[in-house]
Amino acid sequence: HIASIDNEDHTVIMIQVENEIGMLEDARDHSPQAEKAYSGVVPNAMLKAVKAKSGSTWGEVLTHDAYGDEQFMAYWYGRYVERLAAEAKTVLDIPMFVNAAMNSRGRRPGEYPSAGPLAHLKDIWHAAAPHIDLLAPDIYDTGFKQWAERYALPDNPLFIPESRCCPNSGARALYTMGEHEAVGFSPFAIAQSSAGEQREVRQAYSIIDELRPLLMTHRATGRVRGVLLDAEDRETVI
């Protein structure tokens, strides 16, 4: 549908595949089909992703706990998303990303939407879903800078598709662009936010647009930095 109606203006520049995919209440699926897969041979791509030196079945390669179960589930979630993305790109070849709900507040796999495209599972997701261009964090919890840093990686440009819309949203947009050369920053439900919150974001976007030539000139040179000071971070050393 998008390919047919947007083939001239190219309004759609990126597509999100699934939304905060993950497993809740348990770390992995225990259906008969999943148990059969768990007793099967681990694909080579997964062995490389977890740097396994021995073992052939999932039970031999992974730890027998919630974290091992999460890794198993992450690979197969990734394979499912890969099939969707690969097929979609045969019709419309534009960047595609998957977003993640964060594993915050000390929760264990199954207590948060586990096995999604989380930072500690990025190697598994990259191995399982090579047609996915970005793994993207939805940041609603405290520690904004720390969450952003986990996704701003050489093999994963930072894009924040969801973040709590708040008075700091404008500053966070400027920080992600300056410090991490982010692809984008998108506060959630901005249309329902207060006029003051919208004003901060609009002003930040306007500044970024004005700075775009300068930012592009110095992109990947290490000469552009971002500073974010708030109640959580009271100082930054550059």
Give the location of each predicted region:
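A general structural signal for stabilizing positions within well-ordered secondary structure
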Residues: 6, 125-126, 176
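Aromatic- and carboxylate-lined catalytic core of secreted/periplasmic carbohydrate-active enzymes
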Residues: 174-238
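Active-site clefts of carbohydrate-active enzymes
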Residues: 60-68, 95-111, 147-175, 179-183, ...
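Extended hydrophobic/aromatic segments used for targeting, binding, or gating
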Residues: 107-143, 147-152
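Short, flexible loop/turn elements at secondary-structure junctions
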Residues: 16-21, 100-102, 136-141, 162-165
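Polysaccharide-binding and catalytic clefts of secreted carbohydrate-active enzymes
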Residues: 1-122
